[in-house]
Amino acid sequence: MSQQPATTSRAELVSSAVEFLLDQSIADSPLAKKVEFLESKGLTQQEIEEALQKARTGTVQASPSQQSVVPPRPPVPDYYPSAPPLPERDWKDYFIMATATAGISYGVYQFVKRYVVPKILPPSKTQLEQDKAAIDHEFQRVESLLEKFEADQKEFYQKQEAKSKKIDETLQEVDEIINKTNEKNLNNEETLKYLKLEIENIKTTLLKTLDSQKATLNAELSAMEKQLQDIKFDIKTSGIAVAPQLSTPPSESTSRQSPAAEAKPKINLNIPPTTSIPSLRDVLSREKDKDVNSDSIAQYEQRTANEKDVERSIPAWQLSASNGGSSTTSGVAGDEQKEPKRGIPAWQLNA
């Protein structure tokens, strides 16, 4: 009983192998792969040969159990898919193959001709002569190139030497110009220093001169101030002295007049009014506003001359009165001699 199911299972494996071999999808697969697949499924060599023989004959013998009782068909075992059929070759494939073959053949021919044949067969004399001529020609070409290169180098060196000489001359000229410029700058600096010293000396001298002139002018102004005070005082005293003389009766005046007065009975007193005489404050303020220069000195001299003219315009009787010429002015003259140069009168300050 146990042997019968085993035989049936082996027969089923053989029949399935026959069906596998008869399948059209793997008909083009190689036989070795088919045998290898069947061996992987557990079939022996005898069973594989039997399955191959049955596949060739195209008959499948059913087992006795299959003839009597048809069991359910077992599942088809897994197997590898067969390779796809080779594509048909056309003219393109043949053309590519021919081109590749021709290229390979030409490469082999050239390799053999250039590297193999010269080592096997010695070169001919003509070839040696041609190689020698080619080498000589190359040597001549290289020699001509070297000569040309040497000539170019010499010309280049000559140009560089000329340029270097010109540059040296230019640099020398620049150095000379720089030296001359430095000397001129030094001379200019020394001249400027000398001028500065001269200017400082002139400035100092001018300041000293101005100071001395200022002191001189101050002294002269002081003297002028004193003279103005004296003149104003004299004018004031002369006015006081004339009033009593004019008020005396004719008999007394004629009896008291001197012979000089009798000779000049009518005297024109050209006395300027007091308003025409500038005050001291005006004189000082004007002098302070003006700078001490040549114009101010000229104005000062002119003003002094004007004052002298004013002093000269004082009549003789006033001068004689100041010296005690008449009896009416003797007392006033005595007072004037007792109190000389009292200062600026009050009426002048008020003016």
Swiss-Prot record:
Membrane topology reported for the UniProt record: Peripheral membrane protein
Composition bias, Low complexity: 60-70, 320-334
Species of provenance: Pichia angusta (Yeast)
Biased composition (Basic and acidic residues): 283-293
GO molecular function annotation: signaling receptor binding
Protein localization: Peroxisome membrane
Family, per entry: Belongs to the peroxin-14 family.
Gene name tied to this protein: PEX14
Region: Disordered, residue numbers: 54-75, 243-351
One GO cellular component term: peroxisomal membrane
Keywords in alphabetical order: Membrane, Peroxisome, Protein transport, Translocation, Transport
GO terms, biological process: protein import into peroxisome matrix, docking
Biological role stated in the UniProt entry: Component of the PEX13-PEX14 docking complex, a translocon channel that specifically mediates the import of peroxisomal cargo proteins bound to PEX5 receptor. The PEX13-PEX14 docking complex forms a large import pore which can be opened to a diameter of about 9 nm. Mechanistically, PEX5 receptor along with cargo proteins associates with the PEX14 subunit of the PEX13-PEX14 docking complex in the cytosol, leading to the insertion of the receptor into the organelle membrane with the concomitant translocation of the cargo into the peroxisome matrix.
The keyword NAD appears for this protein: no
Pfam families from the UniProt entry: Pex14_N
Disruption phenotype: Cells show an absence of normal peroxisomes.
Predominant cellular place of this UniProt entry's protein: membrane
Listed name of the protein: Peroxisomal membrane protein PEX14
